[in-house]
Regions:
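Extracellular/lumenal and peripheral-membrane lipid-interaction modules
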Residues: 1-131
């Protein structure tokens, strides 16, 4: 599952929040022990893995040691866009999506075993199995 955000938006958010500019020319990934430097062009993609749904929160694990400062800003940006505090950071690599303010979504998801969640810039795909 990938979350992609235009790079200039990340720069603007961090500059506004922290009063400093951020210039990242590449992100380093460790893939099978091989260090790969990936240039940033247009979008910054955060790789996350669906962990679980406890009836109130969906937990997503960040993959590939995503830059911590950017993730903190991502959480703030998503919450501001939605107008509610639904996204939080738990530990070093877990994003928590709170559904408490969306009881109809909780009611729907509790009837199913959520196996996977995948989303891109245009859609949200949830793989559900009846309990």
């Amino acid at each position: 599952m990938n979350i992609s955000i235009p790079y200039h938006e990340i720069q603007d958010i961090i500059k506004k929040e922290k009063g400093i500019g951020l210039d990242i020319s590449h992100i380093e990934h460790n893939v099978l022990g091989v260090g790969i430097r990936m240039p940033i062009v247009g979008l910054v993609t955060f790789n996350v893995k669906y962990l679980d749904f406890d009836g109130h929160h969906i937990r997503l694990q960040l993959v590939n040691n995503v830059l911590n400062m950017i993730v903190v800003q991502l959480v703030g940006m998503v919450n501001r866009l939605i107008g509610k505090d639904i996204l939080s950071k738990e530990g070093n690599d877990i994003l928590k999506v709170s559904l408490d303010q969306f009881p109809e979504v909780i009611n729907a998801l509790q009837r199913f075993d959520v196996r996977s969640i995948d989303f891109n810039s245009t859609s949200l795909d949830v793989c559900l199995f009846l309990k």
